[in-house]
Amino acid sequence: MASLTSLIFVSIVTAAHGQTVVSIPLGHNYTLIGPPITSEVIWAKLGSVDYFDIICNKTKPIIVTCNIQNLTLINVSKVYSGYYYGYDRYSSQYRNYLVRVTQLKTTKMPNMAKIRSDDNSLETFTSPTTPDEKNIPDSMIAIVAAVAVVMALIIICMLLYACRYKKFHPKKQDLLLRLNI
């Protein structure tokens, strides 16, 4: 049994790149096609209690039917999600499946009374008004205040630079820096 476990584990690791992803709607049946056979295909579900579980002889928690090559999943539920690995006992042929169980999306016809009431609400709809002085958003006030502060800082920096330049360079006569401060 240990050699069979190691054979399956090594085969799965090498075959991980060749898996087929299958999405099965909840409650449907689906047949996983096994590899070409020389004797009989053994199917295992990975991630079970013993890391893998040979599933053709089991009845719980999943119900399946097996023939010599294929595995049919019956009345699929969320328990069926996982990795399925089918391999031929006497050759190196295998198939690897990732089964995902999906919920069917059903469309529901809308209620006609609700549609009529929605039509009435469209008739009474009014367009939004422009913001007045009472409805100015706080973000707009913050942006205007930030711009005013930055402009004041730039003006203060320019004045300080002009005063410092005149103090340290008294002999230079720059037309822009003729301030009598």
From Swiss-Prot:
Protein keywords: Early protein, Glycoprotein
Carbohydrate-modified residues: N29, N57, N70, N75
Protein origin, superkingdom: Viruses
Bridged cysteine pairs (disulfide): none
Family to which this protein belongs: Belongs to the adenoviridae E3_20 family.
Functional summary from the UniProt entry: E3 proteins seem to be dispensable for virus growth in tissue culture cells. They are potentially important for virus growth under special conditions; E3 region may help adenoviruses to evade the immune surveillance of the host.
The protein's name in its UniProt record: Early E3 20.3 kDa glycoprotein
